[in-house]
């Protein structure tokens, strides 16, 4: 996978068109303005990196174990589908913003379907955050190790109230702020 910095979807798609007939090379994540992730066959990802370099575009190869969020993950999605098809999902108490569609979902059958699709589909993080902002979501909490998503939210919405929770101390601090 390749992180492309300082470029937008259209520019990257134009570069991908030059090599796509050779195999799989797809936008995997639309993270934030100027941060797009591409996934696919490693040879094509390397070729794309060379094309981007020729066009004076910055990119960084990501040390990942698989080409996530692209059609090369179809077999993994099929496996996931078979694993969860007999699992009962309840209706959530709150709508979930699906990263596949960047829209709300609360139907258990649809959630299950989207959990499978997210394995091979583009992550629409920027669109998801913009959807939430347009629907009056004002506080963004990232729960888990790291602060990558918090940083992406701030790139999308510079004035957003966003923070990350990485420890018990962070939970106490967030609770005291509320």
Question: What is each residue range found by the language model?
Answer:
Residues 88-178:
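Acyltransferase/transacylase module recognition
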């Amino acid at each position: 996978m390749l992180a492309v910095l300082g470029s937008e979807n259209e520019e990257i798609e134009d570069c991908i068109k030059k090599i796509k007939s050779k195999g799989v090379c797809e936008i995997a994540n639309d993270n934030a303005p100027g941060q797009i992730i591409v996934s696919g066959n490693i040879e094509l990802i390397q070729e794309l990196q060379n094309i981007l370099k020729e066009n004076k575009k910055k990119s960084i190869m990501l040390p990942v174990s698989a080409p996530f969020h692209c059609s090369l993950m179809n077999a993994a999605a099929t496996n996931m589908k078979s694993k969860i098809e007999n699992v009962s999902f309840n209706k959530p108490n709150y709508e979930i913003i699906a990263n596949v569609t960047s829209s709300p979902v609360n139907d258990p059958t649809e959630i299950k379907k989207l959990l499978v699709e997210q394995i091979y589909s583009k992550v629409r993080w920027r669109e998801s955050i913009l959807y939430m902002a347009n629907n009056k979501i004002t506080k963004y909490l990232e729960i888990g190790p790291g602060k990558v998503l918090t940083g992406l939210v701030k790139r999308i919405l510079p004035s957003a109230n966003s923070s990350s929770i990485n420890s018990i101390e962070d939970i106490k601090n967030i609770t005291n702020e509320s």
